Amino acid sequence: MSRVKTSPMMLVAALAALVSNLPARAAQVTDVADAIDGDDPFDANLELRVEYTFHRALITRENLQPPAAGGAARTVHVREFEYMRHTARVRPRLEIGLFHDLAVFAEWPLPAWDQQNWSYASGTNAGNSTMARDMRNPPVVDNWTEPGTVYGSPGTERNQGHADWNFDAEQNGEFQKTRSGIDYPILGVRWSPVNNERDDTKPTITLQFDYKPAFLLPVMQHPEDVPGPLSTFAADGTHRLHFAVAFSKRFLILDPYFLADYTFPFASDAAVLGLEPRHDGGFRLGIEIIPYENPTLDQKFVVDLSLMTRYFSPGRDYSEVSDALNELTWTDEWIRAGAQGALVFRAWKFVSFDLTAGAYYDTPHYVTTEVIGCDGGCSSPGILARAVDAFNPNKRLDGNIQVRDRAERNPYYNPVIDTPGRRLRVDESFYFTVIAHAMVTF
């Protein structure tokens, strides 16, 4: 009996022939609702996404240690607090096709539960915590923390002591803050100028622009509320412009993709005074594996695996210590990296479900790093020195910062936690996320 010899190339060719007639629908990151396209006059996707995120981090603090025998004094990071945050959000979304691979969408994040918890880290107690020590007896730094002194917003001193914090310093360091309410809606447009489904020699390229307007909703704290603790509202008073581009190209049962995006934020008039939100941008590299696809029933099962990284710029924003300290803090830049996997099942042409799990890590970064001030006065964004004196153009800049001069000092600088050697830092910061998503197509 003769045998037919096969080769790897023949197997690939056979597999290609097997899947050549399957619908080459774009990867999820590049799929856009369609309209006025042949026998498909109109598409609309109605989606519901439920997200749960757990964030755990260790809050450490710089602390000057006594010199060892024959050595010099040194600064180390001592353990202060364990930080945990549980966040649950519901995100309804509607995407409506306008023309060939052109759609508009609206999404509204609804925070169902947002709870933060602080407590002393393992090995830390009321007797050895540097934060508890400073709450009892705030240190004197450049005469800024003498009894009766305060710090705060330009024009009006904030009626809050330098160490007027929310920690239960004499017990276990516990503090809990819960937020609720609704967040700002997201309005955007998506367009695929090139589509792999229309031309299988080309990738699908999808461009997206969306805007998150900060209006109408109560924010975490209004400027007129100073002094006082940050509120329990979920909105933060920040407008956000978001830009993204994604690429995908189907090959047999594989659909690799790449997504890059950037968010440009700016504070609204209703934001907490001094808010300078962080910019962020990143990319995601992944692949969809399609082990099962039935064109007759219009069904598909997908395994989606991806890696991501994201950069966060410095800024005066809400941080892991803001609610506990009753203030926004200036944070250093950091990078977030992680991986996620998803199972996607398209049960029918009009219905699909997916479940995603992810784990992410933030690089260590300081979260209290305000500068003491600027010669000649400070300006935004951030705390930037001016070329000439802001309040007296005839005054020569002498290179010195007069901390007693309101024109030159940084009003957001808190010497107890912003002075090098006393700053707070976020270490061992991990995120774990689970997302359930359902979509109905009309």
Region locations from a protein language model:
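Residues that define the transmembrane beta-barrel architecture of outer-membrane proteins
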Residues: 84-90, 171, 179-185, 203, ...
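Outer-membrane beta-barrel biogenesis signature
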Residues: 22-74, 197-202, 298-302
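Residue-level detector of the transmembrane beta-barrel scaffold of outer-membrane proteins
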Residues: 43-49, 103-105, 204-208, 255-259, ...
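Transmembrane beta-strands of outer-membrane beta-barrel pores
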Residues: 50-58, 108-114, 184, 193, ...
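Outer-membrane beta-barrel channels and translocator barrels
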Residues: 41, 99-101, 111, 194-198, ...
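Residues on the lipid-exposed face of transmembrane beta-strands in outer-membrane beta-barrel proteins
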Residues: 50, 90-98, 106, 187-191, ...
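Outer membrane beta-barrel transmembrane domains
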Residues: 68-70, 128-144, 164, 269-442
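Outer-membrane pore/translocation modules
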Residues: 113-273, 393, 411-421
